[in-house]
Design a protein with these regions (language model features):
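Short N-terminal "domain-start" leader segments
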Residues: 1-31, 58-66
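A short, exposed loop/beta-hairpin motif centered on an aromatic-Gly-Thr core
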Residues: 26-50, 55, 63
């Protein structure tokens, strides 16, 4: 999968982990609030992080704690 997003947030939700991803910049300008493209749910944190690393650079991944 090609890296094409620059915003990613992993948050726990009940018994799953939700990965939200999208765009944080537009034509070189940083947006005040990121544009969410989609989200996916995974059963474990390891699977969520593995997916996130495929679609965004590692420094763009933000994790939320319970």
């Amino acid at each position: 999968m090609k890296i094409k997003y620059d915003y990613c947030k992993i948050s726990p939700d009940r018994d799953k982990y939700v990965v939200e991803y999208g765009h944080n910049t537009y034509k070189g300008y940083t947006l005040s609030s990121p544009i969410k493209v989609a989200d996916r749910a995974f059963s474990t944190e390891k699977k969520a992080v593995r997916f996130a690393k495929k679609i965004v650079p590692v420094e763009c991944i933000k994790k939320e704690e319970k």
